[in-house]
């Protein structure tokens, strides 16, 4: 029995199952991927967002899944961003959110006022929409 699934937002599908033969991921429109598992599949829709990083060297865009920290994805793609603790408890990776929404509930350094003002720690920030972040902002945050 075959089933069809149609998504109209920036989603990708992941197959989650016990080890079993898998069919390779196939690219689809808008950089989406669909995975098909032969047996025992449980599929979970995962949003992927466009993240524009404005660095002192220029702008770079990447796609970041909603369950991956922005710093981790940037490193995966060879983008050099500042960091120190990677625990959300310092300001080395501080940036300023220009547009969009993020979830940084895992961090412990920024207070509510700083987060409302747009400050972000890229080491503990998940995208929740397409976003623009100015990076390398530790000095401005701590001034």
UniProtKB/Swiss-Prot annotation:
One annotated GO biological process: electron transport chain
Name this polypeptide is given: Ferredoxin, chloroplastic
Species per Swiss-Prot/TrEMBL record: Triticum aestivum (Wheat)
Gene Ontology cellular-component terms listed: chloroplast stroma
Cofactor note text: Binds 1 [2Fe-2S] cluster.
Job description of the protein: Ferredoxins are iron-sulfur proteins that transfer electrons in a wide variety of metabolic reactions.
Record CDD domains: fer2
NCBIfam families, A to Z: fdx_plant (TIGR02008)
